[in-house]
Amino acid sequence: MSRIGRLPITIPAGVDVTIDGDRVSVKGPKGPKGQLEHSLPTPITATLEEGQVTVARPDDERESRSLHGLTRTLISNMVEGVTNGFSKQLEVVGTGYRVQAKGQDLEFDLGYSHPVPVKVSQGITFTVEGNRVTVAGIDKQQQVGETAANIRKLRRPDPYKGKGVYAGEQIRRKAGKK
């Protein structure tokens, strides 16, 4: 049995979990769109009993074992997302590098000949404080992490000067010419 998969997911107050066949829906207090859905993989089943969701698998095949822990973690992240939400912080570092909020979207000046716009996707909010950008939302695995990764990809950290967009990372600096 998977060590992660066998743990039950406790449902906090104010969160409504619905299991309909192979679909798991989670509704919560986080915003008007505080609902997430997940389709269960074929061999995996989920049951709702006494305020807890339990994920089970029918056999010990390799694919079933790997999907067991994954499914339990995805459902747990959905419950966490609709109650507290997720956020990632990014920092813009470099001379002349800046970020500005244009309505709900962002505009980066990253040393290119043109400003780089970033459109907000549905369910994501941006907060700009100086050179820090906070990406927040309820869907961890897709929206928040992917949006933060796409913003970081605009200007990856430079190993020589440490300039770029990154999130609290320790940049491994290289020595320049001698």
From Swiss-Prot:
Give the UniProt keywords, A-Z.
Answer: Ribonucleoprotein, Ribosomal protein, RNA-binding, rRNA-binding
Gene Ontology annotations for the cellular component aspect, listed alphabetically: cytosolic large ribosomal subunit
GO annotation (BP), single: cytoplasmic translation
Q: Which residues cross the membrane?
A: none
Question: SUPFAM superfamilies of this UniProt entry?
Answer: Ribosomal protein L6
Q: Which InterPro entries match?
A: Ribosomal_uL6-like, Ribosomal_uL6-like_a/b-dom_sf, Ribosomal_uL6_a/b-dom, Ribosomal_uL6_bac-type, Ribosomal_uL6_CS
Q: Is Ribosomal protein there in the keyword field? A: yes
**Entry keyword annotation includes Ribosomal protein:** yes
The terms under GO molecular function for this entry are: rRNA binding; structural constituent of ribosome
Question: Out of the domains of life, which is the source?
Answer: Bacteria
Q: Which family does it belong to?
A: Belongs to the universal ribosomal protein uL6 family.
PANTHER family per the UniProt record, alphabetical: 60S/50S RIBOSOMAL PROTEIN L6/L9, LARGE RIBOSOMAL SUBUNIT PROTEIN UL6M
Free-text function comment from the UniProt entry? This protein binds to the 23S rRNA, and is important in its secondary structure. It is located near the subunit interface in the base of the L7/L12 stalk, and near the tRNA binding site of the peptidyltransferase center.
Q: How does it assemble?
A: Part of the 50S ribosomal subunit.
Name of the featured protein = Large ribosomal subunit protein uL6
Organism annotation: Micrococcus luteus (Micrococcus lysodeikticus)
UniProt lists the gene as: rplF
